[in-house]
From Swiss-Prot:
It is an enzyme of class 6 (ligase). InterPro entries: Rossmann-like_a/b/a_fold, TilS/TtcA_N, tRNA_Ile_lys_synt, tRNA_Ile_lys_synt_N. Its EC number is 6.3.4.19. This is tRNA(Ile)-lysidine synthase, chloroplastic. It is found in: Plastid, Chloroplast.
């Protein structure tokens, strides 16, 4: 078997996942594109050499948005069949919903399958260029620090399951070279060239423009920024969680604002967001958030937000 510099890079990445020290069952989420084929090749080569994973399975979610989706599935199954590992195909009824909502449905289906089939790890094919594109998309949508670093190297989603992205430090150019090197059968998805999709326009117009006229290493510069931001965001997140645990009521859905009001504004906002998300699985909007921060807490007050009645009295914020 021929080893390349991407094999070596992959081998250097895997040991960094601390929980990959024993035989594990992994579920590889496929998209059908070049990233998926590259990921399959790297993982199968790695396991053939080290026999590290006790079970490897593949999963593909078909949105049925494309007229050639069935042919794409046959093409993918034909390639995966050489691995002798199980592949699961889920089809979602064609719906007129946004790409973001469809991505969320796909994510839920993959996680549910992983739980039902006792997998330890979900592996995705996101690469470094995907991370840059996601950063630019989120930046234009006005996201905060948390949203800018939304594609972490590794993420724990349940007590038993983690998502890992072993290609996250490998760019699209390297992935394409790898596929050509090993003659991997890339399926050309015509929807990748529809400029009505913002991500495609970023990929084929904005990023080349930034490289040509602003900085040829714009991708690596953005990655460096994201790396630093991720460290700082993690520090703020950990301190926010500590503050939330110290300020929440032990019996009721309530939080003592007196404890957090002297903290930095960034911590105040984070703690309030944690309070609403932890109890109601909702992120409070900026208008309500600013109202709560600026309010005088010596008087009794009620704020109605969606189905919630937010009560404020004597430094306590509580929900009725």
């Amino acid at each position: 078997m021929t080893y390349t510099y991407l094999h070596n890079k992959f081998l250097s990445i895997i040991p960094k996942y601390k929980n990959l020290i024993k035989p594990l069952s992994i579920l590889i989420a496929l998209s059908g594109g070049k990233d998926s084929l590259c990921l399959v090749k790297l993982i199968e080569d790695f396991n053939n050499t080290y026999n590290h994973f006790s079970r490897i399975e593949y999963i593909y979610i078909d949105h049925q948005w494309r007229s050639d989706s069935k042919q794409n599935i046959k093409h993918l199954l034909n390639y995966i069949s050489i691995t002798n590992n199980n592949t699961y195909i889920y089809q979602i009824n064609k719906m007129e919903i946004s790409e973001a909502n469809m991505r969320n449905i796909r994510y839920q289906a993959i996680v549910r399958h992983a739980i039902q089939n006792s997998h330890d790890i979900i592996v995705t094919g996101h690469n470094q260029t995907d991370q840059v594109e996601t950063f630019l998309l989120n930046l234009m949508r006005g996201t905060g620090l948390e949203g800018l670093s939304s594609l972490p190297y590794i993420r724990k989603i349940t007590d038993q399951i983690q998502v890992i992205r072993p290609l996250i430090h490998i760019n699209t150019g390297d992935v394409l070279w790898f596929c050509r090197k090993f003659n991997l059968p890339i399926w050309s998805d015509k929807t990748n060239f529809y400029y009505t999709n913002f991500r495609n326009r970023i990929r084929y117009e904005l990023l080349p423009y930034l490289k040509e006229y602003f900085h040829p290493k714009i991708e690596s510069n953005i990655i460096n920024f994201l790396s630093l931001s991720s460290i700082e965001n993690e520090y703020i997140k950990q301190n926010s969680i500590k503050l939330y645990l110290a300020s929440r009521h032990s019996h009721y859905i309530a939080i003592n604002y007196k404890i957090i009001k002297n903290q930095h504004l960034a911590l105040q906002k984070r703690v309030l967001n944690i309070f609403f998300y932890h109890n109601f699985n909702k992120y409070v909007n900026s208008h309500i958030l600013n109202q709560l921060i600026k309010m005088k807490y010596q008087r009794k007050l009620t704020i109605v937000w969606e189905t919630l009645r937010i009560k404020i009295y004597k430094n306590w914020i509580y929900i009725q």
